[in-house]
């Protein structure tokens, strides 16, 4: 079956967001990333600002804090409500049109569909650090901290909500090293696979 949905999970600083955006442009299909925050907020009943800060990165304080977090009458934590709203939005987008979806555990959420290409973009630390320095105008030490912290939070979120291991090749159709292949080649490989 032809793939009509492309999910891109990525390490921070690997250029996965840029690669996904370029693939969507070249294919003439929709691109979803932070632009789905308002939809998630509406479905969860939370503010867009809260969702923006927490959607992909929660449960940020670890399992102990999660166990004692505030819950609604159904027993769901705020993080669970955000995740459930995110899941619904991603399922709706996949039904609506061909698209590229960045992050948000979309590969797992859409795992039962045959028309999805799941991609994981990673890179070599030195190149990722230099990209973070350029994009965020930070010192090297801050770039390293950002890379480690954000990837750790993505991993915790993914592992918690999917019961799978973030970045493990078995969970994706393609795993591409953007440092070794370059962005253009990553884009071409993805487009060749759909």
Residue ranges and their predicted role:
Residues 41-98:
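ATP-dependent small-molecule kinase phosphotransfer cores
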Residues 87, 183-191:
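Short, amphipathic alpha-helical "lid/cap" segments that border enzyme active or binding sites
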Residues 93, 109-112:
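RNA pseudouridine synthases
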Residues 8-21:
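Glycine-rich phosphate-binding P-loop
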Residues 59-66, 139-184:
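Small-molecule kinase domains that catalyze NTP-dependent phosphoryl transfer to phosphate-bearing small molecules
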Residues 30-41:
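Short beta-strand-centered segment that lines the nucleotide-binding/catalytic pocket of NTP-utilizing
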